[in-house]
A protein has these predicted regions:
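Short glycine-rich, Thr/Ser-proximal phosphate-binding strand/loop in the N-terminal lobe
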Residues: 5-7, 14-63, 229
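Glycine-rich beta-strand-to-loop/alpha-helix junction loops that act as flexible
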Residues: 10-11, 93-96, 209, 320, ...
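Short beta-strand-loop/turn "lid" adjacent to the catalytic site in phosphate-handling enzymes
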Residues: 74-125, 144-146, 153-163
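Phosphate/pyrophosphate-binding loops at sites that engage ATP/ADP/AMP, CoA/4′-phosphopantetheine
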Residues: 76-88, 192-198, 310-321
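Glycine-rich phosphate-binding loop of actin/hexokinase-like ATP-binding domains
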Residues: 153-254
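Catalytic phosphate/nucleotide-handling subdomain of diverse soluble enzymes
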Residues: 218-219, 224-260, 266, 328-358
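Adenine-nucleotide phosphate-binding core of ATP-dependent small-molecule kinases
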Residues: 266, 273-277, 284-316
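Internal helix-turn-beta structural module
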Residues: 296, 300-320, 330-394
Length: 394
């Protein structure tokens, strides 16, 4: 019977899971799936490592299964269907670890209490990340759980990259640039040495482009600057998040439009970005397929902001050796990659159009001074590795 670890990534009305089993000392996915629409029309589906459906259930329209009920179903499924593996722990993606957590940590009640302090900094993610942790602590208190943080990878940034120009009394309360998508960037940094040695050792910008988007500047695989700051609403425009915003806009919304904090939070996190600009969709695929000029405006703004941030991060690096595209848009949209690389020509990026169209791993032209890569991210595998290491050190 081999050891296994479950990785959970919980959202507001869904969660994704992956079951990793140890084979020859390496974690291999043996099952993965998701539970969705937990409060309206719950559905659970699981597939084996080859993609074959091995479990499926629907509860019907109007059912309210909730996270607790879905977790109960998942635990039962794992016991029934993957009994050949011994579950040794659970790894969780937790968006915000603040200043306290610079590496993955074994969870107990005190850790949960500490992490709840960061709910206001990541309202779309943090409370939902913590929900399954608390549920499993109550149901299976002896099962080790490990929290892995999207902020930890960036804690090694130089102080100047983390600071806002605010009074020390505010900074000391934890108002800093934290950066996010760290598990994705950490995974990319971990695989670069075997795929792109120059990118691994040099000055590299990784573009995590998806429904949530950010960019990270690395030197020798270590984060030195990133586009997201105090919250995951900063930086690039995203599916529904506005990205970089003049603080004066928030004051105007309060003083002149009479909006309160909750209304502004909803605007910034749920009604802006690609959805807000286009008025059509938060999904880049929908916008790319549309001939509506508002869709074009949203795409143009997205590309423009990426180009601006490329210049900023290249300045922080003092030059540029490689760029890496990852996440849903970065891995799958040859059109967006072409536009970004075109805008980055002044930095020395030259694209191989055919390689880009084929979604090759290396998409830079032979004449390009800056390497260009497409590397799929794997945050779940990163969490599984961390969870195993923490559990082994107990």
């Amino acid at each position: 019977m081999g050891d296994a670890i479950v990785v959970l990534n919980a959202g507001s009305s869904s969660f994704k899971f992956s079951l990793f089993a140890e084979e020859a000392g390496r974690p291999i996915v043996v099952a993965r799936g998701q539970a969705e629409a937990l409060y309206t029309s719950p559905r659970f589906v699981a597939k084996d490592g080859a993609g074959t459906v091995i479990g499926e259930k629907s509860w019907g329209t109007g059912a309210k299964l909730g996270h607790d009920g879905a977790l109960d179903h998942l635990v039962g499924f794992l016991r029934d269907r993957v009994a050949q593996h011994r579950l040794i722990g659970v790894g969780h993606r937790v968006v915000h670890g603040g200043r306290e957590y610079t590496k993955p940590v074994l969870v107990d009640a005190s850790v949960v209490a500490a992490l709840e302090k960061y709910v206001p900094l990541a309202p779309l993610h943090q409370p939902h990340n913590l929900t399954p942790i608390k549920a499993l602590l109550a149901r299976l208190p002896d099962l080790p759980q490990v929290a892995c943080f999207d902020t930890s990878f960036h804690r090694a940034q130089p102080p100047v990259a983390q600071a806002f120009a605010l009074p020390a009394s505010i900074t000391e309360r934890g108002v800093l640039r934290y950066g996010f998508h760290g598990l994705s960037y950490e995974y990319i940094a971990s695989v670069l040495p075997e795929r792109a040695e120059r990118a691994a050792q040099g000055r590299t910008i990784v573009l995590h482009l998806g429904n949530g988007s950010s960019m990270c500047a690395m030197v020798a695989g270590r984060s030195v600057a990133s586009t997201m700051g105090f919250t995951a609403a900063d930086g690039l425009p995203m599916g529904t998040r506005c990205g970089n915003l003049d603080p004066g806009v928030v004051l105007y919304l309060i003083d002149s439009l009479g909006m309160d904090a909750r209304a502004i939070e909803k605007l910034i996190y749920q009604e802006s970005g690609l959805l807000g600009v286009s008025g059509i969709s938060s999904d880049m695929r929908v916008l790319l397929a549309s001939d509506d000029p508002r869709a074009k405006s949203a795409i143009d703004l997205f590309v423009y902001r990426i180009a601006r941030e490329l210049g900023s991060l290249a300045a922080a690096l003092g030059g540029l050796d490689a760029i890496v595209f990852t996440a849903g848009i970065g891995e799958n949209s040859a059109y967006l990659r072409e536009r970004v690389c075109s805008d980055a020509a002044w930095l020395g990026v030259a694209l191989d159009a055919d390689a880009n169209a084929r979604n090759d791993t290396s998409i830079g032209a032979r004449t390009s001074r800056v390497e260009a890569w497409v590397i799929p991210t794997n945050e779940e595998l990163m969490i599984a590795r961390h969870a195993r290491a923490v559990i082994d050190r107990r």
